[in-house]
């Protein structure tokens, strides 16, 4: 045993290091699970931007506008479980993720404006399925890079959904590498059989 080993208990030190590693792995695993729980929770909610009324902090006012939105978009207000106001938008908890997608889809089809809600302000009202900040950032990067070639780009459960038009394939973008791949390669080649591989591995998940 050398002098250094005499000064410290090597076995105890190794045990402490291994314990620290195990705790670090547990923390990483816990963070992953928390993110999954947050994503699942948000999938049942929508975020509504653009309603030009300073009273949205009041639940009574939010309910008033939500009922108007439901009437205009042919949605069932019974699916609304709760609502909150966060910074510059409403967050609406719905009964399930299918309802959240329905709200987003009908909002795109009918293009609500403040005038539609009886507000004297010329600005759009937009509804999106709720998502964590990192997914919103990925959505912004995908839109900046791929529009207007890809006309349909939106948040979905596992990332960002990308498609060229209503009848083309749908791809799931999960990181910037996927965005860059679509941007730098033949954007129309993905409709060809077998063209959806890079370096022998599938880079994007085809969900159709």
UniProtKB/Swiss-Prot annotation:
InterPro entries per UniProt: FP_N (IPR004941)
Protein name from the UniProt record: FP protein
The organism's taxonomic lineage, starting at the top: Viruses, Viruses incertae sedis, Naldaviricetes, Lefavirales, Baculoviridae
């Amino acid at each position: 045993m050398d002098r250094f080993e005499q000064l410290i208990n090597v076995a105890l030190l190794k045990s402490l290091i291994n314990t620290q590693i195990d705790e670090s792995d547990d923390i990483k695993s816990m963070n992953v699970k928390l993110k999954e729980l947050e994503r699942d929770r948000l999938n049942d909610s929508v975020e509504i931007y653009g309603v030009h009324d300073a009273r949205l902090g009041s639940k009574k006012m939010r309910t008033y506008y939500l009922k108007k939105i439901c009437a205009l978009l042919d949605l069932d207000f019974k699916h609304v479980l709760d609502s909150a106001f966060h910074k510059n938008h409403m967050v609406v908890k719905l009964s399930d993720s299918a309802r959240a997608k329905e709200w987003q889809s009908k909002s795109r089809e009918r293009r609500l404006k403040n005038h539609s809600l009886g507000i004297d302000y010329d600005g759009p009202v937009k509804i999106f399925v709720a998502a964590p900040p990192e997914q919103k950032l990925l959505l912004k990067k995908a839109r900046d890079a791929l529009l207007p070639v890809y006309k349909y780009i939106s948040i979905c459960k596992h990332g960002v959904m990308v498609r060229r038009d209503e009848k083309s394939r749908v791809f799931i973008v999960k990181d910037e590498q996927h965005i860059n791949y679509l941007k730098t390669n033949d954007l129309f080649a993905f409709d060809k059989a077998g063209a959806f591989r890079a370096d022998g591995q599938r880079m994007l998940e085809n969900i159709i």
